Amino acid sequence: MSDSDNIPSRRKDDHLDIVLDRRTAPATVAAGWEYIRFEHCALPELDLTQIDLRASLLGKTMRAPLLISSMTGGVLRAEAINRHLSEAAQALGIAMCVGSQRVSLQSRNSQGLTRALRRMAPDIPLLANIGAAQLREADGLDLACRAVDALEADGLIVHLNALQEAVQPEGDRDWRGVLAQIARAARSVDVPIVAKEVGSGLSASVACALVKAGVAVIDVAGAGGTSWAAVEGERARDAADRAVAMAFADWGIPTPASVQAVRRALPTVKLIASGGIRDGVDVAKAIRLGADIAGQAAGVLRAATVSTEAVVAHFEIVIRQLAVACFCTGSADLAALRQARLLPSAHLPAG
């Protein structure tokens, strides 16, 4: 394999190192979850142990409305990370999406992104993942089908990372025709398409265009979590490249605002909120604003490098927090949580 062929793999290694390293993990704009406050119900008239957190995604029932969001898919360390995540997702009954499969599909090393993941997690919604820019390539549709087949996935995430590509020295600059290719993928791939930003959020107009093109699920992946512009700035070798990237470290639509806007424009679309989800209270707020599912990536990445048990322990806390949020709003289930009263706030993010 040539040096140029190794660039994507080295880049994924850089990304993982930066996100994991507390000294270099990029600071990001606040998502704004702290401005959203529930009206406390002092008399819930509920049994906390009977709160129903079940949700569904891609025809499968989940024990809680949680998605392990896209993380790493192209480095050698990914095999252990993805094993821990898939085993934990199966144990918890929550959904999982792998990171970009481009490297594993275009190299001889599967790096753990095989049907073995499906065998570890036979009952959960499992999503494959490729970049929108890769769909424009000559073999883009074939790559999409192979990504799904490699995992026996229930759906295919097409991630929209235009900002990251724009500030990445080796990034894909030409995004003409991407929407048309997404529409072709929606017709050609045997599973539903999930369109996902990667930290800059989706506007209502873009979400509507994606759904019109045949996308079945929207993941807003708004600002407030990992800033991939800042990550690219951290890995930049050239001062000018770093300066360009860092100017966009706080760019994007905050996740709460993106969720509200997309839900108003598309009342029935399956909607995932990710980007700055810190805990189960943020999950509850996302559900209240209109999301069906909440996703978390960087927040669980460190646990994923340790063990399956560490990932399970992490999400068990998130699930307990979500249940208490339901209890303290008088919500017996997620449908009731969507109607929970919020305190008036002048700082509620506009959507």
UniProtKB/Swiss-Prot annotation:
Sites where the protein binds substrate: R11, K12, S100, Q101, R102, Q164
Catalyzed chemical reaction(s): isopentenyl diphosphate = dimethylallyl diphosphate
Key words, A-Z: Cytoplasm, Flavoprotein, FMN, Isomerase, Isoprene biosynthesis, Magnesium, Metal-binding, NADP
Enzyme Commission number, as recorded: 5.3.3.2
Tree of life domain: Bacteria
Chain positions recorded as Mg(2+) binding sites: E165
Family, as annotated: Belongs to the IPP isomerase type 2 family.
HAMAP family to which the protein is assigned, alphabetical: Idi_2
Assembly and interaction partners: Homooctamer. Dimer of tetramers.
Full protein name: Isopentenyl-diphosphate delta-isomerase
Protein's gene: fni
